[in-house]
């Protein structure tokens, strides 16, 4: 009996316990979930490795158990379900990562940000942006400057042959069509090109081809490269508003010239003097009209300037007003003041460019001896020197009137005995860009004390630039080279010996084929000096004593700011028939440096520097097709001077209408191609640019343009976007 009671009590106790457990579970399930904010905050701060607390909430366990109980899945089904959930979660995570991240391309150059591109862009992204822009950005050639160079070398790349970088594009020809009338559309069948045989004049009122918008100065390339595309796209709209061709130092000149250039010439690549002095590169270029020669032997080592005319536009201009009436005479001596004003005269042009500071360190050390000489220098001596100079300037020389016949017009050169118009002694100290002045060493010869004093007064101190080649002259007579050399000429012609140091301007190996080394030895007085020298490659005529002295003194006076005296020396050298003097004096006439501006007479002197005998046979009738060249090696690496720069300047004169009634693109292109055949790199690039664009007088020829660009690229020109010139369809040979 007692045993049964115990069994029943035990069973009842178990049942009651089960009921209480179920009741507790139901109450817990019906009660609201506890707030686990404290636990969640604690989980983020502490680790539960040594704790008995669970990081999983009771609610999640309860919900999972209820779902599994309702599904009644087996163990295998549960595993399959968990794997499917994991795969779906991984797929969604990968899709999100692919849309938000991609490969990063790091550019090694400074000031170039990292470029991030999406490999698999979403359809919405493609619709939001232009598809062509994405494709162009993903191309590797858009990040290259030229050839196979990476974009990291954009800022560091400096061309060795040309002053400019040229924008070369295959299909861009909007500039030509933007300035034409609707009835002049060349796509129509009724359009007829002008007849070039009738006086070489177009009948459709042509606008001159604006080639300046397709080239940029290398000194400004790294500043303008980020905004190059945007400025080039907006340049067409700015052409209509720019009547006077005004530009700023931060924009590329894109203005077009519809009338011939007057005395106010354009400044296509205008920037400040500080930028010019800090960014000027000099090397062994043979490309320039801006090549100014410090001495006679410098012709094969010119400055890296493409054109004198372009150089005048590269400096910042100074607008003179009527209020500028306080003259300060520029002194060749070094002064403490860094500024000077310019006097406006009747013969002075409205726009005068200021010279930049020389971009090299010159030895201009003042010694106490020089200051003592200035202290004890009497006014009588100064007046005497000035009187000698004036009397020498009026000394009689050979008088003749030269007549040059070019393009059917007789260009009369003035008599060489006529003096230069005395316009004003206070002209701007501009003309040719400042070149390094080389130090000349005179061989020690027995002289009297009076001769030494004369030489010290007549010869100014010269600075020496170590990075350029040195020129040393030896003179047999100490009186040769003085200011009185015109009146003390000897009957025996004198040829100074020139010795050039084999130092390349580009830091490269010297070109032995174009250098002439003079080995000379001086013996005792009374013995004959033995010399051994090869013939100079680019100087067919020997330099006469008068010619070399005039050119050297003219350049020295120009550095001292004596523009009128410098122009007078150049004119006297022209009387001797010096081709270099023709080039320099013609450029002086073009820009009004020391003489009155005369564009037509300037063209005559530039023509004389080219040594062209028959204009029709040697220029107009000459068909130079670069596609027919047997080999690019036939074109010399160094252009002959001053012939090539003179041809280039004549081409620029015809393209811009300097010295004629209207621009003539056909004749200008003929001059450029002739200069390009001689190795002038800028002429090659401009010839290709002109042939790549359609104009009023010709159709564009991309094959011919690509041929010129390939030659220029091989010679060291910097071409932007030049991948297309090596396509197979542009490599075909032209008709012979």
Curated annotation (Swiss-Prot):
Annotated InterPro entries: Mitotic_Regulator, Sel1-like, TPR-like_helical_dom_sf
Compositional bias (Basic residues): 374-385
Basic and acidic residues biased stretches: 14-24
Comp. bias (Polar residues): 1-10, 25-46, 197-208, 264-284, 392-410
Changes seen on gene knockout: Rescues temperature-sensitivity of MPT5 deletion. Partially suppresses the hydroxyurea (HU) sensitivity of MPT5 deletion.
Low complexity: compositionally biased ranges: 238-256, 285-294, 303-318, 335-350
Region (Disordered): 1-46, 178-208, 229-410, 440-461
Gene Ontology CC, one term: cellular bud tip
An individual GO BP term: negative regulation of G2/M transition of mitotic cell cycle
PANTHER family in UniProt: ACTIVATOR OF C KINASE PROTEIN 1-RELATED, PROTEIN DSF2
Note: Present with 377 molecules/cell in log phase SD medium.
Protein name, entry field: Protein DSF2
